[in-house]
Amino acid sequence: MDKHTAAIPTLTIKVVLLGESAVGKSSIVLRFVSDDFKESKEPTIGAAFLTKRITRDGKVIKFEIWDTAGQERFAPLAPMYYRNAQAALVVFDVTNEGSFYKAQNWVEELHEKVGHDIVIALVGNKMDLLNNDDENENRAMKAPAVQNLCERENLLYFEASAKTGENIYQIFQTLGEKVPCPEQNTRQSSTHDRTITDNQRIDLESTTVESTRETGGCNC
């Protein structure tokens, strides 16, 4: 980072990704952080921590991104990752009805445990599976159900594709606009009050930190 960039005000935003396994959370992060996509990707075991900086309106926005495991056995440990988050992406697969209802549960839990100040974006991922489907026969959830949830819970809503990159950057850009900007934000990311560094994977069962070589994982 050069001296000019270092002088630009920086807003740090902690973002947590939640959703059922295999809805594409890690692929969304990988697309945003590295502009990459892997057709075959192993499920997240634990949680991955990644960062990405963008410049917007004369300030640097640093996203501290927690990509959490979607398996049910890890769900009780998720609060340690969404605690103190300013924003959340709650992801579902547009072709999987069950994943939408799981996303709805996550939204309700966030509002119950974190409060209503957190900015939540509901993301319908895998739109690439529908782009050639004129009749939307493969779409699991119709617009009214999604819109009702967004209006009731005051959510942002995006339909996206980690595979093609559709709307991925726009999701994070919008979070950067919606999260309030304090005069100074010096919060550090931590797990059990332990500071960690970029691009590391967390073992949710033992809460130990392990290095990883992986670099990535429209309003209603």
From Swiss-Prot:
Sites where the protein binds GTP: 19-26, 67-71, 125-128
Membrane topology field: Lipid-anchor
GO molecular function: GTP binding; GTPase activity
Compartmental location: Cell membrane
Family annotation (CDD domains): Rab5_related (cd01860)
Modification Cysteine methyl ester occurs at: 220
GO BP terms: endocytosis; Golgi to endosome transport; protein targeting to vacuole
Alphabetical list of InterPro entries matching this protein: P-loop_NTPase, Small_GTP-bd, Small_GTPase
GO cellular component: cytosol; early endosome; endocytic vesicle; endomembrane system; late endosome; plasma membrane
UniProt entry keywords in alphabetical sequence: Cell membrane, GTP-binding, Lipoprotein, Membrane, Methylation, Nucleotide-binding, Prenylation, Protein transport, Transport
Record Pfam families: Ras
Residues anchoring lipid (S-geranylgeranyl cysteine): 218, 220
Coiled-coil zones: none
Role description: Required for transport in the endocytic pathway and for correct sorting of the vacuolar hydrolases suggesting a possible intersection of the endocytic with the vacuolar sorting pathway. May be involved in recruiting the MON1-CCZ1 complex to membranes enriched in phosphatidylinositol 3-phosphate (PtdIns[3]P) or other charged lipids, leading to recruitment of YPT7.
Other remarks in the entry: Present with 830 molecules/cell in log phase SD medium.
Protein name in the entry: GTP-binding protein YPT53
Source species taxonomy: Eukaryota, Fungi, Dikarya, Ascomycota, Saccharomycotina
